[in-house]
Amino acid sequence: MNFVLALTVNTLLALLLMTITFWLPQLYPYMEKSDPYECGFDPAYPARIPFSMKFFLVAITFLLFDLEIALLLPLPWALQTTNLPLMTTSSLMLIIILALGLTYEWSQKGLDWAE
């Protein structure tokens, strides 16, 4: 009963908030207010310069490998199961996939900064 009540209240609250944001008028920002502030002077450089694609690729690679390391963390507890060959095989497969991904990224020069 408590679960149904909490689910109903949360659903109604989410629908209410979505309805309010849909029907509120759209605010149009002024160009003066959206300009970057640099000590009262006009900015010396544009504020919205594009960033390097190399940096983006390295950041995405870091996030992917960080997530996969988070998958490796519970392996010591998982290896205490009764079906040890299955857990060992799946652990080795995950590590092999990580190693193959790293070697592919390395061979494609995705981790090299200097060109």
From Swiss-Prot:
Query: Which EC class is the enzyme in?
Result: translocase
**Protein keywords:** Electron transport, Membrane, Mitochondrion, Mitochondrion inner membrane, NAD, Respiratory chain, Translocase, Transmembrane, Transmembrane helix, Transport, Ubiquinone
The GO annotation for biological process reads:
mitochondrial electron transport, NADH to ubiquinone
Provide any one GO MF term from the record.
NADH dehydrogenase (ubiquinone) activity
Question: Which reaction(s) are listed as its catalytic activity?
Answer: a ubiquinone + NADH + 5 H(+)(in) = a ubiquinol + NAD(+) + 4 H(+)(out)
Q: Which InterPro entries match?
A: NADH_UbQ/plastoQ_OxRdtase_su3, NDAH_ubi_oxred_su3_sf
For whether the record's keyword set contains GTP-binding, the answer is: no
Q: Does Transmembrane show up as a keyword for this record?
A: yes
Enzyme Commission numbers on file: 7.1.1.2
- On the tree of life, the source organism's domain of life is Eukaryota
Q: Where in the cell is it found?
A: Mitochondrion inner membrane
In terms of Gene3D superfamilies, this protein maps to: NADH:ubiquinone/plastoquinone oxidoreductase, chain 3
Principal place where this protein is found?
mitochondrion
The UniProt entry's GO CC annotations, sorted and at most eight, read: mitochondrial inner membrane; respiratory chain complex I
Membrane topology term reads:
Multi-pass membrane protein
Q: Which residues cross the membrane?
A: 3-23, 55-75, 84-104
Query: Which Pfam families does this one have?
Result: Oxidored_q4
Q: What does this protein do?
A: Core subunit of the mitochondrial membrane respiratory chain NADH dehydrogenase (Complex I) which catalyzes electron transfer from NADH through the respiratory chain, using ubiquinone as an electron acceptor. Essential for the catalytic activity of complex I.
The family assignment reads: Belongs to the complex I subunit 3 family.
Oligomeric state and partners?
Core subunit of respiratory chain NADH dehydrogenase (Complex I) which is composed of 45 different subunits. Interacts with TMEM186. Interacts with TMEM242.
Per its record, how is this protein called by name? NADH-ubiquinone oxidoreductase chain 3
Q: Whose protein is this, by species?
A: Pongo abelii (Sumatran orangutan)
